[in-house]
Curated annotation (Swiss-Prot):
Localization per record: Cytoplasm
GO molecular function: deoxyribose-phosphate aldolase activity
Organism: Crocosphaera subtropica (strain ATCC 51142 / BH68) (Cyanothece sp. (strain ATCC 51142))
Major localization listed first in the record, in broad terms: cytoplasm
Name of the protein: Deoxyribose-phosphate aldolase
Pathway(s): Carbohydrate degradation; 2-deoxy-D-ribose 1-phosphate degradation; D-glyceraldehyde 3-phosphate and acetaldehyde from 2-deoxy-alpha-D-ribose 1-phosphate: step 2/2
GO biological process, one term: 2-deoxyribose 1-phosphate catabolic process
Active-site residues annotated for this sequence: D96 (proton donor/acceptor), K157 (schiff-base intermediate with acetaldehyde), K185 (proton donor/acceptor)
GO cellular component terms, A-Z: cytoplasm
EC category: lyase
Length: 221
């Protein structure tokens, strides 16, 4: 077990996420209030909640992130591009884009590259590509990671949380591929402080979780 007093400020790693399909304006307000109170650098909400989150966090040093093509990645590239541009116009500065898993499985490198690079170029925002590592072989993970880095992504993200969660093995694998070129966002099923520490030790530079408050309280307790 990793010691509780490890020299890590867990709050600074957290993308405070509220991605329940039943999210209400009151839920988004609570999410933003928690981010301010606990010092989370980012909130992650659905595209329909971006404008509200931006207004609530006006003047704060807290980024608003949203998801694109979520959670399956099966939208057409033009739809994803529109989603990304609209989210940017509404104030989002970070975009978590779901990769097209069918294209990864088929080895369609050019299509994947073109989709990600178009969004990177059109928005100029921080781009995190969700690879859904639980559904890919190691060969497919490597292919997807290398294409996304070449296309201009800023982060490789493990999972959407809909098809399993982040593992230490996958974070370490992606970190070894990236060699510091991009950040690694571990996401999905991060509920305990020990999990969080282990993922950070493996190379995660961001943690996407809806349990950020509990993690910080556990560290401070």
């Amino acid at each position: 077990m990793i010691e509780k007093n490890i020299n890590i400020d867990i709050a600074t790693y957290i993308d405070h996420s509220f991605l329940k399909p039943t999210a209400t304006p009151e839920d988004i307000e609570q999410c933003c209030n928690e981010a301010q109170y606990f010092g989370f650098p980012t909130v992650c909400v659905y595209p329909s909640a971006v404008s509200q989150a931006v207004k609530l966090l006006h003047g704060q040093k807290i980024a608003v992130c949203t998801v694109i093509g979520f959670p399956t990645g099966a939208n057409t590239s033009s739809v994803k591009l529109y989603e990304a541009q609209e989210a940017t116009e509404n104030g989002a500065t970070e975009l978590d884009i779901m990769i097209n898993l069918g294209q990864v499985k088929a080895g369609s490198s050019e299509e994947i590259y073109n989709e990600i690079s178009a969004i990177c170029e059109a928005t100029g925002q921080t781009i995190k590509v969700i690879l859904e590592t639980n559904l890919l072989t190691d060969t497919e993970k490597r292919l997807a990671a290398e294409i996304c880095m070449d296309a201009g992504a800023n982060y490789l993200k493990t999972c959407s949380g809909w098809f399993g969660g982040a593992t230490v093995t996958d974070v370490r694998f992606l970190n070894n591929i990236s060699q510091g070129r991009v950040g690694i966002k571990a996401s999905g099923g991060i509920k305990t402080l020990e999990q969080a520490y282990e993922l950070i030790e493996a190379g995660a530079t961001r943690l996407g979780t809806s349990h950020g408050v509990a993690l910080v309280q556990s560290q401070n307790g």
